[in-house]
Amino acid sequence: MDIIGGQHLRQMWDDLADVYGHKTALICESSGGVVNRYSYLELNQEINRTANLFYTLGIRKGDKVALHLDNCPEFIFCWFGLAKIGAIMVPINARLLCEESAWILQNSQACLLVTSAQFYPMYQQIQQEDATQLRHICLTDVALPADDGVSSFTQLKNQQPATLCYAPPLSTDDTAEILFTSGTTSRPKGVVITHYNLRFAGYYSAWQCALRDDDVYLTVMPAFHIDCQCTAAMAAFSAGATFVLVEKYSARAFWGQVQKYRATVTECIPMMIRTLMVQPPSANDQQHRLREVMFYLNLSEQEKDAFCERFGVRLLTSYGMTETIVGIIGDRPGDKRRWPSIGRVGFCYEAEIRDDHNRPLPAGEIGEICIKGIPGKTIFKEYFLNPQATAKVLEADGWLHTGDTGYRDEEDFFYFVDRRCNMIKRGGENVSCVELENIIAAHPKIQDIVVVGIKDSIRDEAIKAFVVLNEGETLSEEEFFRFCEQNMAKFKVPSYLEIRKDLPRNCSGKIIRKNLK
């Protein structure tokens, strides 16, 4: 069955402009408080102008164009402008530094870059090293350096007509994007995402939170990340809703933004929930229109209950990864929710728990979470120019090995245990980092926590805890270890404690454990 009706992204935007016209499609708020609004008609015109800009710079179907941008309207223009002419977007994590960004440019074969002035010096250095195919840079800022091969994105775009000049034949199987994984354990891999993937993601994610055209979906997730693109933006646009894109997350500003824009759906990660909870309570905390808060792993039950009670919201759990495109397991619309379950498998997918020999396990037994989808349609197509890595995780019949451990119950609710690489082997016992982190996070003085395994000559691995304290708090080792001993089995109690000001995170808020080992 063809869920998307054979419609690629160019057709999608032309239809949206016709159907929704002057209805608000996109609101962008910068960190400085500047707000830009676009109707569906205006946004389609900006997308067309951007597509024409790329065409005048020599970009054709199949060419790769990198974006190194924070959340901004230009990201949306470029994303869909490239798709309209069959070119391929390569978003770069805005937190990456020179060597990491150069590596993605090299391995994606990007020939053009759109970025802002704050990142330009880094790319000057990359160009001088002459190790990439990059031949031109467009800067979104008005002020331009006097360099060859650099253009003003805004000036060039505004010179273009609002109708599309170049419209090559497109297929839903065409690649729309190469999205490099966050690489918390190794070098990033380029996840190939098709037009079909993005169109399907829109319909699926809109179904998951029952989006309507009168909804307002607000996110602070980075636009270069799969959550923002496929769970938020594609869902909102596919439903004809209003999409609110905030440049960066601020714990002090976020709830006010939810209220100001009358958001009905938003999404949170644990870091956001924890930092919101340490903000001063307000009598207005429950004065909002939120129907759903999309939530991604992992939170203790105490933290969940406290957040929901204070803000008067409910969490809609969703589990997925870049390779699955969407939250393939999650709470279903109208279905019961069973915390701490991550929900049930969504439509168009199958899910199993498998053992180390790739055999399905019965309910209650822990193994690897495996997902069956259709490559290039409901799950990613492949890793770019990396068939060995693709074959390692994706079977010929569409079964994807997630690398996550979990189990299911008799009613097919699934439960996440941990990343396989986050299991600590301690004296013959397997210890889940997430389990320990959820227990330790309940300590009233602790704001953030991560545990890792470090080498131990006697017991394979020892457990070390890194904690960030709430402002003004102090915590002795004696108090910390006593709390652990009272709340977990003896073999799970950490051997070491380190108190830090912050923890290293990637763009999606996940802690980069390898930086702590």
Curated annotation (Swiss-Prot):
NCBIfam families: PRK08008.1 (NF005947). This is Crotonobetaine/carnitine--CoA ligase. It comes from Escherichia coli (strain K12). Belongs to the ATP-dependent AMP-binding enzyme family. Pfam families: AMP-binding, AMP-binding_C. Keywords: Ligase. The keyword Ligase applies. Its EC number is 6.2.1.48. PANTHER family: ACYL-COA SYNTHETASE, MEDIUM-CHAIN ACYL-COA LIGASE ACSF2, MITOCHONDRIAL. Coiled coil: none annotated. Changing residue 388 to K: In strain: O44:K74 and B. It is an enzyme of class 6 (ligase). One of its GO terms (biological process) is carnitine metabolic process.
